[in-house]
Every structure is written in structure tokens, then in C-alpha cells.
């Protein structure tokens, strides 16, 4: 029996089922990656977690269950996403596996019948064989990592699912606490009664020792990124009034909260006396209608309200920032847009605090930046964390936003390295009086590939940053011809 491959895959004969059972364990799969290329854009651990084994050929990996094979990995690829596109019926990717007398779970992340999670709360129950696979696959694709879809009940504390109930829990909130009950309750947190410790009603995660610079949503998202509330998932909760509260689960229903405002024309009419600096047409297009009280607006679909608008704020971005689960927002802008807004906001918030130079704060900022997948990839390519952080800070200071793609970050890092090298060279070299013709000749030579001396330089080597060869000659070298550093990545550039 063979698997008919698509582009980026190969055909393999299905292996023996008993042999495959060895690789139900993620650890056993990871051991096959001992000789996996370190220069691969997707890490061995990510591929193993997605059910793959290393074949020993190039960057080709193969699923232990469906035996689909994938190669030619690129930066930004989702291991689980490509796995599911190539083999949508794979038992592993859908949360099931072969049955040997009893149901054997192969949900990614399960080992010895238990779930593994970075933010694990309490014990995990065995996977339920009759659970619809869509739940599992949806989370794998959206978060890129394993989350608990066992029989654990969500929300963890149904009594606190409404923001009103959470606010009431803060009656004895200590005076020394830096954050307000309103902000904490809005982020899904209620007071436990101990010190300044709060707990999420949904995932059960606990947070305490708040600092003045902390923001409730950011800390909740940073420490418990798989929380269903943080992800904006529908867990079928209702507020005390029987209707989803504004901040709980904006996407908990496919029906709009205010059908009368579902049309753009109906919403724009409500801005008749609008005096705020934010464009009313943009607000209406983003799903908001005016309440007639100052600059207060509300989304017709999720019911989320916003106020105190600043001139530079974009309605779509604020909608995504505060109400990421809104179905209207999701339909209009897509999940990738929402994810990018939250990633950018987290980085700007962290980097924007660098004016306060306390050791504990600096460490917290560094930890937040370091957890960014783009930063981890750049570090793996040989760039220093110090240079990455500096480049990201400069990006935010000059443009007001952070990086949304790894390629742009790498290009700026390479450019910064080149500028530093040129500055050092100009400081130490003697100024020579040379003719215009000689300068032109040298400039032309500098652009030529140092190997063939025929074509122009088109590749920069990472991590050394040297500009040495054309594209054709670069394919034939593994070490930089100038410094003999092992090349981990070859970045194409365009020289003017």
C-alpha cells in the first residue's frame, strides 16, 4: 500500500504497525532527529511534536502513523499545518490511533496516558476516544502546540464566568496591589483572597506578585497562552443575566448581539454628532456603533465596548486587541491578523517599558522578548540576543510597530551588522587621497563575487554577515571564504 503524495512530499510504503507503536511516544520520535540539519527553519522538537520521524535524508520527515513524508521546510511553516494539509485523515493529527484491544491515545503531547503541557494545571484525564477530532485539530492549527482537550471541565470555575461575579470577588483586594479589580476581572481573573493572588475562571491559572508595569491581559496571555479564554474560544458560558457578558466570550454565538446594527448604514447613522478624532467611517466598518455618550462605541456582534480613543488608534486593531474572539472580526480580518495584533502589542508593551531599569523588570522584559518565536529563530541562526533586542527597540521607536515577519527582522539584523563593520573599518583605516576613477574601480570590484569575479554579490552569510559571493557560487560553499565560519543561513540581498 502506498500514500499518494502532494507537492513537498514523497511516496513511502507503509511500515509495520507494531513497529509504528514505538513512536507513539514523542521522546522516541525525537531521538530519530540526532543527525537532523541544525540549519532547518523548523526545529526537530517541533517536527517530533507534530508526529514526524527523521528519515535521514536532507530535511525529509515522515509521520509515524500515516507515513506521509514532507521536505523543503521554509521559515514560517507550521509543522502541524502542513501535516494536516497533506494527510487530513491521519489518525495522529486527528487525535486517534490504532486500537489494540483498548483505545490507545496518540494525541500529540500525551505520554503514558497523560497530557504534557508547559502550563499544566492539575492532573490530566485520559483522552476520550469518542471526542470529535475537530476540537483537537482546531487547537493544533491555531496555537501550533498541544493543549488539553481531555475530559477536564471548562471553565474551571463556572461561578466566575461573568465579569460581574469576578468583580465582586475583589471586595477585600489589598490596598498595596498595583492593578485595579476592573482590569483583572476584564482579563478573566478573580481574587482568591490570598495576598494579591488571582485566578483565571477558565484555565485555573494563578498569578500573583503584581508589579506597577504589569498588564493583566498580557500576563495572563504570557503565562497561560493556551487558556481557552485567552484564545477567545466558545466554552458555552453565560453571564448572570443569561446573556454573554461584554468581556467574557465575544464569539460565543454566531448571532449578533444587536442585529439592528448589523448593517454598516445603520451603524454610521449613530455617529451623527461624533466629535472624536477617530474616523467614524473606520469605526463603523470595524463593527462599532456610537452609544451617544462621549466617545463610547460598541460592537454590534460581540457587544464589546471601547472608549477613551486616541487619535492614532486604529478601530480594527483595538477590536482585535480587546475582543479577539468576535466572530465579525474573525470573518472580516481572519485569525492571522488577530494573532499578529496580539504579538505586536505584547512586544511593544514589553519594549516600551525599558525606561524603567530595575533588574527584575529588565529580566521580565527580556524573558518576554525571548519567548517570541521569531527571536528564537534568529538566535538559532547565530544572531545575539543583545543585537536582536536592540534592533527590535529601534524598529518600534522609528515606526511605532514591531516586526511581523522573520525575513524583515533578519534583513535588518544583517544590515545592522554590516553598518557596524563599516563604521569600525572607517575609524581604523587611514584616509587616502585617491582619484575619482580609482574610487569607481574599487566600488565596482567590491560588488563582484570574490570567487568567480564575474557576477555581482547577491548573498550574505549568517552568522558572520560577510558579503562575498553571487547566488551561484554561494550554493557551493558551506563555510565563509573570508572567515571560515560555518554558514547556518544564506540570505539573498539586492545591491543597488
UniProtKB/Swiss-Prot annotation:
Post-translational modification: S-Nitrosylation down-regulates its E3 ubiquitin-protein ligase activity. Autoubiquitinated. Ubiquitinated by TRIM32; leading to proteasomal degradation.
Residues carrying S-nitrosocysteine: 449
UniProt catalytic activity: S-ubiquitinyl-[E2 ubiquitin-conjugating enzyme]-L-cysteine + [acceptor protein]-L-lysine = [E2 ubiquitin-conjugating enzyme]-L-cysteine + N(6)-ubiquitinyl-[acceptor protein]-L-lysine
List of residues binding Zn(2+): 299, 302, 319, 326
UniProt xrefs under InterPro entries: BIR_rpt (IPR001370), BIRC2-3-like_UBA (IPR048875), IAP (IPR050784), XIAP/BIRC8_UBA (IPR042579), Znf_RING (IPR001841), Znf_RING/FYVE/PHD (IPR013083)
Positions of region (Interaction with caspase-7): 141-149
Top-level class of the enzyme under EC nomenclature: transferase
Tissue distribution of the protein: Expressed in small intestine crypts (at protein level). Expressed in bulge hair follicle stem cells, sebaceous glands and dermal papillae (at protein level).
Signal peptide: none
Disrupted gene: phenotype observed: In knockout mice decreased number of Paneth cells in intestinal crypts, decreased proliferation and increased goblet cells in the intestinal villi. Increased weight loss following intestinal wounding, increased inflammation, distorted tissue architecture, muscle thickening and greater crypt loss. Delayed dermal wound repair. SEPTIN4 and XIAP double knockout mice show delayed dermal wound repair and hair follicle regeneration, via increased apoptosis of hair follicle stem cells.
Cross-referenced Pfam families: BIR, UBA_BIRC2-3, zf-C3HC4_3
GO biological process: defense response to bacterium; DNA damage response; negative regulation of apoptotic process; negative regulation of tumor necrosis factor-mediated signaling pathway; neuron apoptotic process; nucleotide-binding oligomerization domain containing 1 signaling pathway; nucleotide-binding oligomerization domain containing 2 signaling pathway; positive regulation of canonical NF-kappaB signal transduction
Domain of life: Eukaryota
EC number(s) from the headed UniProt entry: 2.3.2.27
Protein localization: Cytoplasm; Nucleus
Cross-link (Glycyl lysine isopeptide (Lys-Gly) (interchain with G-Cter in ubiquitin)): 321, 327
BIR repeats: 26-93, 163-230, 264-329
A GO molecular-function descriptor: ubiquitin protein ligase activity
A GO cellular component entry from the record: nucleus
Zinc finger regions, RING-type: 449-484
Alphabetical UniProt keywords: Apoptosis, Cytoplasm, Isopeptide bond, Metal-binding, Nucleus, Phosphoprotein, Repeat, S-nitrosylation, Transferase, Ubl conjugation, Ubl conjugation pathway, Wnt signaling pathway, Zinc, Zinc-finger
Quaternary assembly: Monomer, and homodimer. Interacts (via BIR3 domain) with DIABLO/SMAC; the interaction inhibits apoptotic suppressor activity. Interacts with HTRA2/PRSS25; the interaction inhibits apoptotic suppressor activity. Interacts with TAB1/MAP3K7IP1 and AIFM1. Interaction with DIABLO/SMAC hinders binding of TAB1/MAP3K7IP1 and AIFM1. Interacts with TCF25 and COMMD1. Interacts (via BIR3 domain) with SEPTIN4. Interacts with RIP1, RIP2, RIP3, RIP4, CCS and USP19. Interacts (via BIR 2 domain and BIR 3 domain) with HAX1 (via C-terminus) and this interaction blocks ubiquitination of XIAP/BIRC4.
Family to which this protein belongs: Belongs to the IAP family.
Function: Multi-functional protein which regulates not only caspases and apoptosis, but also modulates inflammatory signaling and immunity, copper homeostasis, mitogenic kinase signaling, cell proliferation, as well as cell invasion and metastasis. Acts as a direct caspase inhibitor. Directly bind to the active site pocket of CASP3 and CASP7 and obstructs substrate entry. Inhibits apoptosis in intestinal crypt cells, its activity is mitigated via its interaction with SEPTIN4 isoform ARTS. Inactivates CASP9 by keeping it in a monomeric, inactive state.
Domain statement: The first BIR domain is involved in interaction with TAB1/MAP3K7IP1 and is important for dimerization. The second BIR domain is sufficient to inhibit caspase-3 and caspase-7, while the third BIR is involved in caspase-9 inhibition. The interactions with DIABLO/SMAC and HTRA2/PRSS25 are mediated by the second and third BIR domains.
Record-given protein name: E3 ubiquitin-protein ligase XIAP
Lineage: Eukaryota, Metazoa, Chordata, Craniata, Vertebrata
Designated gene of the protein: Xiap
